[in-house]
Design a protein with these regions (language model features):
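A short, Lys/Arg-rich alpha-helix, primarily the initiator
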Residues: 1-23
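Short, basic-rich loop-to-helix N-cap that marks the start of a DNA-contacting helix
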Residues: 46-59
């Protein structure tokens, strides 16, 4: 797994939050300090999250990158070492 995959999973999680009504594009934009149109484009895949934006949204939502790693992926990584 690479950072692009983790970023893809983070964006998918944010899309799910918006679809379920637990967050709004505007609210996510405020958390990261970007405009709502910019956040919209990030969620639609037209723009990518910068590292700073990803860090901010993770911190504000009390998430960690490990929240986006499946247990089986961790076990596979341990086996390869």
């Amino acid at each position: 797994m690479d950072f692009r995959e983790l970023r893809r999973r983070l964006v998918a999680h944010l899309r799910m939050l918006v679809r379920s009504g637990d967050a709004t594009e505007r609210g996510l934009a405020r958390l990261t300090g970007v405009s709502q149109p910019h956040m919209h484009n990030v969620l639609k895949g037209k723009r990518v999250f910068s590292l700073d934006m990803a860090d901010q949204v993770l911190a504000q939502l009390h998430l960690d990158l490990l929240d986006f790693v499946e247990p089986g992926e961790m076990m596979e990584r341990q086996r390869r070492r």
